[in-house]
């Protein structure tokens, strides 16, 4: 686990927002004013060697956050600083250099690998693009990486269809580590895998982090997965960041009603403890990002909402050292034994 005290952040995100046009087509994009607010004014930092978990329901904007940081899509507003440099002010050459230090692990191990390329070609592709080493050196590096992620280096000339889902994701992990990056954005890297395989991949990511000192932005919707690997965790709802803290505090004493409801739904493998836990049921479905609620975006489903919640946006403020929450009535809610070993 990384110590974030008195350290310079590797990645700093300030008031990041991303909107998409609601309609497609040339004229709609030019004349329509309707937009989907995917990410709205979020800020956080990631320090060298730490894992920062980003969790939320589907459609909350967590994957868009990762893609915007990587500059795969341009932000509507806000700034992203990587190693102290403003990404928006980087030239194309500097962007390419940044991507050498910042890599991506995709969610789908089937769609993220080119079926026409061998495993060796897939893993060596980042090195080829960035002109790293000779062909022989790249092949040797690929063999080393395959061995590190638990695959047989002799399978270097095989194709993706010859591997299982878990093995394919290991290939994706090997590719992400090929350039020895300082930060890897993991976009739900285990959600498409069987539960039995998820733990293996998570443990592999932790081992590689210990070995290479790489930082992770770990995006997921499964709270137990995020808890298993993260140093700090942020919770998103409908494009907004509602709570952020170290994982122990967040999972034991969440302050935001949305975080509390998510954690109350995490099952505990002890029937005696499970019987005593209070389940928080949310009413209705998340509102459309096309027309988000006024004030606090969570107030339409919040069990403790009052008049001010629909009128005024809550400040994202510190409720304890290192623990921030966006709620007018933030209070700790003790969670009994929410930890789950994968």
Each language-model region and where it sits:
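P-loop NTP-binding/switch modules centered on Walker-like glycine-rich loops
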Residues: 185, 189, 193, 197-275
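Helix-to-loop junction immediately C-terminal to a conserved catalytic motif
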Residues: 70
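A short, proline-enriched helix->beta-strand linker immediately N-terminal to the Walker B motif
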Residues: 178-182
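Conserved ABC transporter NBD signature motif
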Residues: 78-86
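Conserved ABC ATPase signature
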Residues: 159-163, 167
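Conserved ABC ATPase "signature" region
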Residues: 86, 137-154, 260-264
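Charged, flexible cofactor/metal-binding loops and thiol motifs
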Residues: 7-9, 23-30, 246-342
